Amino acid sequence: MDDNKRKSLDAALKSLDKTFGKGTILRLGDKEVEQIDSIGTGSVGLDLALGIGGIPKGRIVEIYGPESSGKTTLTLHIIAECQKAGGVCAFIDAEHALDVKYAKNLGVNTDDLYVSQPDFGEQALEIVETIARSGAVDLIVVDSVAALTPKAEIEGDMGDQHVGLQARLMSQALRKLTGIVHKMNTTVIFINQIRIKIGATGYGTPETTTGGNALKFYASVRLDVRKIATLKQNEEPIGNRVKVKVVKNKVAPPFRQAEFDVMFGEGLSREGELIDYGVKLDIVDKSGAWFSYKDKKLGQGRENSKAFLKENPEIADEITKAIQNSMGIEGMISGSEDDEGEE
């Protein structure tokens, strides 16, 4: 760059710093590239699929899928992991359906969880903005976008047309929220439902998410959660096999997938993942129906091995660390013992 251009640019930068504050615009070469902090999801496989050890801090995240696919369960596990790392969490229960007992079973410290049950969409998003601006909350969950009903629709008569109101509400809110959450390093998770597009024909999926297109654009990470099988024991359903696809990722390569068990009343099965990934990475040995780790037999069959790991958390922790070492994600996951020790 020649001297005249440099002087003009320096004058412009000084003017911007004076008007908006120091650091308004920086040259990337002058600033060390920061590693993106993350919040663990409670799933080793999903933390790996996300590429940074969990969901990114200071970003907007969308988790969507059909009903009863495990969206809220996954989100409650993320809250539990955030709390383990010393984070403060808030749950905006627009659906008025939070099961406190189930949240406790999943490891959420409900005594320290801030919960709001707003009456209409504008109120919910105003609450999100206010607590995000405080800079004191690490994670805010909104359950769900479909339940963010505009005030005009609630106060109107049944059958009134309110075309595009919710989409405009979401677009306006997200324009404001994006900068706030980045500045305050607060993560906002929106849980969303899927709908079938009316009159959809030809190629591509007929499915779409509620609340318009704004969330698709503003979200740094979008997770598609699907139930792929029912887990049974003695012909009795005991849980679901769930697949999560990272359909959008601005902080790491997208389109990776993770699968895990979600057990009824217990949530995500960490032990099931340890066996699956342990076998895949040759950390856990499988001989016939028997599973073993080093010189210890874990059990005959997957369910018995899961039960053994649940009763022996020290062995489960050892296998977890071995998997993280093998995958190269050790120390990336918030809430790990190493992270707690550093704090």
Swiss-Prot record:
Keywords: ATP-binding, Cytoplasm, DNA damage, DNA recombination, DNA repair, DNA-binding, Nucleotide-binding, SOS response. GO terms for molecular function: ATP binding; ATP hydrolysis activity; ATP-dependent DNA damage sensor activity; damaged DNA binding; single-stranded DNA binding. The keyword Protein biosynthesis does not apply. The keyword ATP-binding applies. ATP binds at residues 65-72. GO terms for biological process: DNA recombination; DNA repair; SOS response. It holds the Pfam family RecA_C. Gene3D superfamilies: P-loop containing nucleotide triphosphate hydrolases (3.40.50.300). Can catalyze the hydrolysis of ATP in the presence of single-stranded DNA, the ATP-dependent uptake of single-stranded DNA by duplex DNA, and the ATP-dependent hybridization of homologous single-stranded DNAs. It interacts with LexA causing its activation and leading to its autocatalytic cleavage. This is Protein RecA. It comes from Campylobacter jejuni subsp. doylei (strain ATCC BAA-1458 / RM4099 / 269.97). The lineage of its organism: Bacteria, Pseudomonadati, Campylobacterota, Epsilonproteobacteria, Campylobacterales.
